[in-house]
UniProtKB/Swiss-Prot annotation:
Gene3D superfamilies the UniProt entry points to: P-loop containing nucleotide triphosphate hydrolases (3.40.50.300)
Record keyword Lyase present: no
Record lineage: Bacteria, Pseudomonadati, Pseudomonadota, Betaproteobacteria, Rhodocyclales
Name of protein: Phosphate import ATP-binding protein PstB
Organism: Dechloromonas aromatica (strain RCB)
Family (UniProt): Belongs to the ABC transporter superfamily. Phosphate importer (TC 3.A.1.7) family.
Length: 259
C-alpha cells in the first residue's frame, strides 16, 4: 500500500464573497492553498482569478466601495487575513505580490529591493546589504546586477525587471507569493527563466499564480483551480485536472471548446 503525505495548509478561503460596489465578483469560494506548493488559477478573462488573488494581500482595500464577506485563514497562526483588526501592511509583509507587467520603482536596483525592508524598520547598512543580496540571489538575478546595484532599475531588460520585482517581493521573507500573469509581457526566454525560478522558489515559499497559459499552468503548478463567472468550478492536483477533470466546464475550457 502506498502512503501519501497529506499536504499542509498554508491558507484557506472560506465562503469568500467579494463585491465591487454592488457587483458580486466572487461567489462563495472555498479553497485550500497548500504550503510550499504552486497553485495555478485558470479560467476565462473576467472570471475572478485576479480578484481572488488580490484578496490575499488586501489590495482591494485601496479602493472605496470594495468589500469582502467570509474569511481567508492563514496558517499556522489561523489568522483571518480579511479581519478589520488585521493591519493590511502586516498582511503585505507576509503575502508578497508580483504583477503582470514589471513595475520597478524609479529608484536604483538596490533601493528597489531595500524599500520593503526600510518600511519594516530595517536601517542597518550591513543587514540591508545582506538581505538585498539574499533576495537578488533568490530571484536568480544577483550575478547579472551585483556590479551595478546603483544603476536605475527601469534601465534593466523586461525579464530582469520582473526578476527584480520578485526579489523585491522576497526581501521581506513572505510566506505566500502571488503572481498575476507574471510572464504575459515577456518573451519566451524570459518566460522560461521565470518558470524555472518558480520551481526553485516553492522550496521556500507558497505560490499562487494566475495564468491564461494552459501549458504554463501544467508546467509550473502542483494544484490547479478552474474559475468561471466568480465561482470555483473545480480544484485538484494539476495532473488530475488536466488529464481527467471531473466537471465538463473544466474539460471544455482546458480543451479549448470554451474560451
Amino acid at each position: 500500500m502506498q502512503i501519501h503525505d497529506k499536504p499542509t495548509l498554508k491558507a484557506e478561503a472560506r465562503n469568500l464573497n467579494f463585491y465591487y460596489g454592488e457587483a458580486k465578483a466572487l461567489k462563495g469560494i472555498n479553497m485550500p492553498i497548500y504550503d510550499k506548493k504552486v497553485t495555478a488559477l485558470i479560467g476565462p478573462s473576467g472570471c475572478g482569478k485576479s480578484t481572488y488573488l488580490r484578496s490575499f494581500n488586501r489590495m482591494h482595500d485601496l479602493y472605496p466601495g470594495n468589500r469582502y464577506e467570509g474569511e481567508i485563514r492563514f496558517f499556522p497562526d489561523n489568522t483571518n487575513l480579511l479581519s478589520p483588526e488585521v493591519d493590511p501592511i502586516e498582511v503585505r509583509m507576509r503575502v508578497g505580490m508580483v504583477f503582470q507587467k514589471p513595475n520597478p520603482f524609479p529608484k536604483t536596483i538596490y533601493e528597489n529591493v531595500a524599500y520593503g525592508l526600510r518600511v519594516r524598520g530595517e536601517n542597518n547598512k550591513r543587514a540591508l546589504d545582506d538581505k538585498v543580496e539574499h533576495a537578488l540571489r533568490g530571484a536568480a538575478i544577483w550575478d547579472e546586477v551585483k556590479d551595478r546595484l546603483q544603476d536605475m532599475a527601469p534601465n534593466l531588460s523586461g525579464g530582469q525587471q520582473q526578476r527584480l520585482c520578485i526579489a523585491r517581493a522576497l526581501a521581506t521573507d513572505p510566506e505566500l507569493l502571488l503572481f498575476d500573469e507574471p510572464t504575459s509581457a515577456l518573451d519566451p526566454i524570459a518566460t522560461g527563466a521565470i518558470e524555472e525560478l518558480v520551481h526553485e522558489l516553492k522550496k521556500r515559499v507558497t505560490i499562487l499564480i494566475v495564468t491564461h497559459n494552459m501549458q504554463q499552468a501544467a508546467r509550473v503548478s502542483d494544484y490547479t483551480a478552474y474559475m468561471y463567472l466568480g465561482e470555483l468550478i473545480e480544484f485538484g492536483k494539476t495532473d488530475e485536472i488536466f488529464i481527467k477533470p471531473q466537471d465538463k466546464r473544466t474539460e471544455d475550457y482546458i480543451t479549448g471548446r470554451m474560451g
